């Protein structure tokens, strides 16, 4: 599978990540996470309390995506401290990126279609709806904040990525392809497979009969009450073009 990505963008991200993480710094962050947070990952992983240090995730995805450290090293470190049953969910989440890569490699038409769609949808970038969403100037305060966080830090909590994607697709009614492109542009850990397939899943194009619709109460709960977009989000998902592939 040949992934046609702008090499300059990837090179720029790699340089930024290398500035954030030397190998020793990445290993230090990994050990700190395993020692202080890994045992609570399963119960706390969906909470986004704002700053990374307040959350129960590792924040290592940029380092892993650029192979500063590998999944194997991370998994061995975790399993040297905990039984499999204690950290099963954490192990599953680390392996998701590998699963997505294999899935897309065996269904390369999904990527080809995505690239074609981006060309066909270019005209929408001139719309006010797209401009407001891509600049964080909507009427949904939490969405605007996430967009700013994405652009400034190159990172969003995984649960927040789902909320963002859902609002983009189902509330703002913008094509998932343009949202996926935005993530690819700004996320330091952006991966063509996991990013594309995750957006398709939220849109309802990945698993037949399944869409993801962000819920204001869910956002309030999992942000510790920081955010509550009451009466601002769509209650019905946009009809998907499901192909089940």
Residues covered by each model-derived region:
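C-terminal catalytic domain of photolyase/cryptochrome flavoproteins
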Residues: 3, 13-158, 166-245
């Amino acid at each position: 599978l040949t992934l046609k990505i702008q090499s300059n963008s990837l090179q720029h991200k790699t340089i930024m990540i290398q500035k954030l993480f030397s190998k020793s710094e990445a290993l230090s962050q990994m050990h700190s996470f395993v020692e202080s947070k890994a045992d609570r990952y399963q119960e706390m992983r969906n909470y986004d309390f704002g700053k990374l240090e307040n959350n129960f995730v590792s924040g290592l995805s940029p380092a892993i995506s650029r192979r500063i450290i590998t999944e194997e090293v991370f998994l061995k470190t975790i399993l040297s401290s905990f039984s499999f049953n204690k950290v099963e969910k954490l192990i599953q989440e680390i392996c998701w990126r590998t699963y997505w890569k294999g899935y897309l490699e065996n269904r390369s038409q999904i990527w080809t279609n995505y690239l074609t769609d981006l060309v066909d949808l270019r005209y929408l970038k001139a719309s006010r709806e797209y401009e407001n969403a891509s600049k964080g100037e909507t009427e949904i305060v939490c969405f605007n904040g996430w967009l700013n966080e994405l652009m400034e830090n190159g990172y969003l909590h995984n649960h927040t990525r789902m909320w963002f994607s859902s609002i983009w697709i189902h509330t703002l009614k913008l094509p998932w392809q343009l949202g996926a492109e935005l993530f690819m542009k700004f996320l330091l850990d952006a991966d063509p497979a996991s990013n594309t397939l995750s957006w398709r899943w939220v849109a309802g194009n990945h698993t037949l009969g399944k869409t993801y619709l962000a819920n204001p109460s869910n956002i309030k709960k999992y942000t510790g009450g920081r955010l509550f977009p009451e009466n601002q989000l769509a209650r019905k998902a946009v009809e998907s073009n499901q192909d089940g592939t």
